[in-house]
Amino acid sequence: MTNKIYNLDKTNIKDGVQCIKKLWFNFHEPIIIKDNPEFHKGERFGLIVRENYGNGLDLSDNFNIQDVVIKTEEALKSKNTNVIYEGAFIFEKTLVRTDVLIKNRDGWDLLEAKATTKIEEKKNVLKKEYLLDLSIQTFILKQCGVNLKNI
């Protein structure tokens, strides 16, 4: 059994809101799907996001969560880092990974990038699950002391 530095992550929380049994199975009988097409679609979309926001610290290929948390903390303090891709934050043993953090004049902007093929009729309305996603990230980042200015 591995000794994880976190118990919950954003996906577990969202799954638990959707269905408590799903959360239970995620913890007690997890299924690991290595060739999930959705995962690969997300990888490709991540490349497009990085092309649009330019050079920055890209932590997307690092799956050692403790290492990613440390590198994210260092990048937040660095004067040379303006963009962080796939940063990691842990508060109260709850993990979130952010898609993009962009340094602005007096803090950081949080960008949640979504790869979707559905076109919403109401263009300016965020889907409920996106709001939950951003709410979880915002709470954890603020608890970790990140000065968020725009979400």
Task: Cite the ranges covered by each PLM segment.
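Metal-dependent nuclease catalytic cores that hydrolyze phosphodiester bonds in DNA/RNA
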Residues: 1-107
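Mg2+/Mn2+-dependent nuclease catalytic core
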Residues: 76-151
